[in-house]
Amino acid sequence: MPKMKTRRGAAKRFAKTGSGKFKRRKQGLRHILTKKTAKRKSRLGQSATVDSANIGQVKRMLPYA
């Protein structure tokens, strides 16, 4: 059986933490930033974890993570 391929787009977007969760960036910090408050932009800069409902999908996309 051949090796499973990693989805390269997902590999660039998600990182596995030591506890086995997946880290991701928050959306909304690329453009149209003038109407967003400094507090909101600061919070958007922090990383978030992948929700439990989506962990299975991420694991399938990253078989070797």
From Swiss-Prot:
Region ranges (Disordered): 1-49
UniProt xrefs under SUPFAM superfamilies: L35p-like
A single Gene Ontology CC term: cytosolic large ribosomal subunit
A GO biological-process term: translation
UniProt feature coiled coil, ranges: none
Record keywords: Ribonucleoprotein, Ribosomal protein
Single GO molecular function: structural constituent of ribosome
Pfam families in UniProt: Ribosomal_L35p
Superkingdom of origin: Bacteria
Compositionally biased intervals (Basic residues): 1-43
InterPro entries, A to Z: Ribosomal_bL35, Ribosomal_bL35-like, Ribosomal_bL35_CS, Ribosomal_bL35_sf
HAMAP family: Ribosomal_bL35 (MF_00514)
NCBIfam families: rpmI_bact
Family: Belongs to the bacterial ribosomal protein bL35 family.
Protein name: Large ribosomal subunit protein bL35
Organism encoding this protein: Maridesulfovibrio salexigens (strain ATCC 14822 / DSM 2638 / NCIMB 8403 / VKM B-1763) (Desulfovibrio salexigens)
